[in-house]
């Protein structure tokens, strides 16, 4: 069995990764457990375990609760997870926001330098969503239509001058603000609450995001995230 760990900054990212994995792989070939870090302690949030002999992948997702702690939380646990519990890959996912766009390469290099100091550096990966994970949501331009059939791409363009089909969502300074504006058209307040995050993440077309070359070229950070997952899944 291949063990893969994810460290994410919050519940929206955690729910997105859970749903992405469940759409990307065939059940019952995997098991997923999500954990919320509470200081030095942790608490299980969701568990999708099974005892099928077909299980090939075991995923553990840590909801760190803060973008600044994603990498440090991974590094604090990496040695034990890799050497004792035999995790093949640990991936850290966080938003570039609130940092400025021009700091992107600086942050990536800083994290990779920290990883390179470790003997198990080849088992670590860092993904920076530009500017926020909501840019990945916006790339699925029919997402909002699935949430409410008033919210077609043309309707959104006419009302807000946001062209979901043509725009590069990674160029938005605040993708989350775009999501908030779009949902406000149907009187939905986007506050990243758990129920709301589930509703959004369960309406995303993950096959479209993963396998459309046009979309992959728009959201390069997501393309890299999927690449890291694929490398982990096919490690043996």
Which residues fall in each region the model found?
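Extreme N-terminal starter segment of soluble prokaryotic enzymes
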Residues: 1-5
């Amino acid at each position: 069995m291949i063990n893969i760990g994810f460290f994410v900054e919050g519940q929206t990212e955690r729910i997105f990764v859970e749903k992405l994995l469940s759409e990307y792989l065939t059940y019952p070939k995997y098991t997923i457990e999500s954990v919320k870090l509470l200081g030095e302690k942790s608490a299980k949030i969701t568990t999708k375990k099974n005892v099928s002999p077909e299980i090939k992948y075991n995923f553990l997702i840590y909801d760190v609760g803060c973008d600044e702690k994603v990498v440090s939380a991974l590094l604090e646990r990496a040695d034990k997870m890799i050497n004792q519990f035999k995790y093949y890959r640990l991936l850290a996912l966080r938003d570039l926001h609130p940092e400025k766009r021009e700091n992107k390469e600086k942050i990536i290099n800083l994290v990779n330098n920290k990883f390179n100091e470790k003997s198990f550096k080849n088992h670590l990966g860092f993904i920076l969503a530009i500017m926020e994970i909501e840019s990945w949501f916006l790339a699925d331009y029919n997402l909002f239509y699935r949430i409410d059939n008033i919210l077609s791409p043309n309707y959104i363009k006419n009302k807000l001058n946001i062209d979901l089909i043509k725009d590069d969502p990674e160029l938005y300074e605040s993708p989350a603000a775009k999501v908030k504006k779009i949902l406000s058209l149907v009187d939905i307040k986007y506050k990243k609450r758990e129920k709301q995050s589930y509703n959004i993440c369960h309406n995303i077309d993950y096959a479209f995001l993963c396998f459309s070359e046009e979309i992959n070229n728009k959201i390069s950070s997501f393309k890299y995230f999927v690449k890291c997952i694929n490398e982990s899944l096919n490690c043996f």
